[in-house]
């Protein structure tokens, strides 16, 4: 079954492990060992193959919709090495990174699998650069008194620009030079029952002490098509506490944890800025989002000091995608300095920041995002407390300029020893084969049984009719 207008180059099938891709025609490759090959479909379109009469849209299945999509090797090939990659731009065309000395790949030499990893819990941050100031208009906020160096702020946010939400609250304490950790939770309610949701009140219910760093906190997003977190019973209880009769499906929450306070720029982390008005004795909190809308409530907890062992490890420069305890953690990788990569060459660069609070048993690796066609980030294994080094290959024909503002990929670590038997939900990168594994046994690839029987068939469309999201 071919997708989009290229009906002969690729074939996709539903298998027990996910969506299987394979090349149907020979693929001619240019000079060089590393290659980025474009698939003629996005992850969203691949999961909506029902528009061609196969099954109902897989994207509507909660196990798929709330998962992390990964593109990995479906079958080994001795002459082609396929690097695993994760997909965070579900509407962008997918790319696969391969290493081979062949100049032509025969049909079915390239076998890929779009895996939906749904066992891990993801807390999604706002990965945007902060802007100066908090905007002209801010909603009235309420702040609890600072105790033990902690400050909790909650209230209703108002759009201060097309891409920012703002909140103003009174605070007469000392400047927040010592606030190091922060937890930000944005919640809103949709549909029936919104009148009983805390989004209608100025004071959002304050969760119990320690709730902000609990592993039971699970998140969603305010916009369709963005990466969503797995929502379990714990997440529903946490998100709906104190909300009356609001149904769990009517509420959505965005939870953001991280570290670091830049006193020079008044910045907690990318996407969050605070400014102080000495004349009015108030503080403005400004949060950047993709699209600012009314109806959002925030609950912010600022704390001093480094993270505890219970809270896991964090990257000091960028909170990234953070999970706690037995789950795994993702960090976006930015070069520490500016660099230029010549065409068809690779260089070694150091990533910004370093892990804090980790144990020597932590292992991880760096990997490529699937929606990039400009460079290849070779997977590298590293341990906690060691600098994160990256090997960047320029697969283009022009010099590649990278710097601190360039997100090259992501780093992943898991709190487990490298062994042949990992707990369910763990992700493992096998150093010898360069393959990504998930589940109890690392000897087999990740698995996902797609509930085909529960899906509703859609009318069959012609291949010439474009996909519509």
Curated annotation (Swiss-Prot):
Residues 203-244 are annotated as: Disordered. InterPro entries: Herpes_Orf11. Belongs to the epstein-barr virus LF1 family. LF1 is absent in strain B95-8. This is Uncharacterized LF1 protein. It comes from Epstein-Barr virus (strain AG876). The lineage of its organism: Viruses, Duplodnaviria, Heunggongvirae, Peploviricota, Herviviricetes. The gene is LF1.
């Amino acid at each position: 079954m071919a997708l989009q207008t290229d009906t002969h180059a690729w074939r996709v099938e539903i298998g027990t492990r996910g969506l299987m891709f394979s090349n149907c025609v020979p693929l001619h490759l240019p000079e060089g060992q590393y290659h980025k090959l474009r698939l003629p479909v996005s992850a969203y379109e691949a999961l909506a193959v029902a528009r061609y009469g196969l099954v109902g849209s897989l994207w509507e299945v909660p196990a798929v919709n709330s998962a992390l999509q990964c593109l990995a090797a479906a079958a080994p090939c001795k002459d082609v090495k396929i690097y695993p990659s994760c997909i965070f731009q579900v509407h962008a065309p997918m790319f696969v990174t391969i290493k081979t000395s062949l100049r032509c790949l025969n049909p079915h030499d390239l076998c890929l699998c779009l895996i939906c990893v749904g066992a891990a819990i993801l807390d999604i941050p706002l990965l945007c650069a902060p802007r100066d100031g908090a905007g002209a208009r801010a909603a009235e906020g309420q702040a609890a008194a600072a105790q033990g160096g902690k400050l909790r702020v909650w209230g209703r946010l108002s759009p201060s620009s097309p891409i920012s939400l703002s909140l103003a609250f009174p605070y007469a304490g000392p400047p927040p030079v010592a606030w190091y950790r922060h937890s930000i939770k944005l919640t809103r309610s949709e549909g029936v029952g919104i009148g009983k949701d805390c989004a209608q009140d100025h004071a959002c219910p304050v969760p119990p002490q320690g709730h902000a760093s609990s592993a039971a906190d699970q998140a969603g997003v305010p916009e369709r098509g963005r990466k969503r977190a797995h929502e379990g019973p714990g997440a529903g209880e946490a998100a709906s506490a104190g909300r009356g009769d609001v149904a769990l499906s009517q509420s959505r929450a965005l939870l953001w944890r991280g570290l670091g306070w830049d006193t020079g720029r008044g910045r907690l982390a990318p996407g969050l800025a605070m400014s102080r008005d000495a004349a009015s004795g108030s503080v403005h909190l400004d949060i950047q989002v993709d699209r600012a809308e009314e109806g959002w409530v925030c609950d912010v907890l600022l704390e001093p000091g480094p993270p505890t062992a219970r809270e896991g490890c964090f990257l000091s420069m960028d909170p990234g995608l953070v999970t706690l305890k037995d789950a795994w953690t993702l960090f976006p990788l930015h070069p520490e300095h500016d660099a230029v990569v010549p065409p068809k060459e690779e260089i070694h660069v150091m990533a910004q920041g370093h892990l804090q609070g980790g144990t020597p048993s932590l292992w991880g690796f760096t990997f490529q995002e699937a929606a990039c066609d400009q460079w290849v980030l070779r997977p590298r294994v590293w341990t906690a407390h060691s600098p994160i080094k990256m090997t960047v290959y320029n697969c283009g024909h022009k010099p590649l300029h990278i710097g601190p503002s360039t997100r090259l990929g992501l780093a992943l670590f898991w709190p487990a020893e490298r062994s042949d038997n990992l707990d369910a939900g763990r992700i493992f990168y096998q150093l010898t084969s360069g393959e990504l594994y998930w589940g109890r046994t690392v000897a087999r690839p990740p698995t996902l049984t797609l509930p085909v029987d529960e899906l509703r068939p859609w009318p069959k469309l012609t291949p010439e009719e474009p996909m519509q999201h």
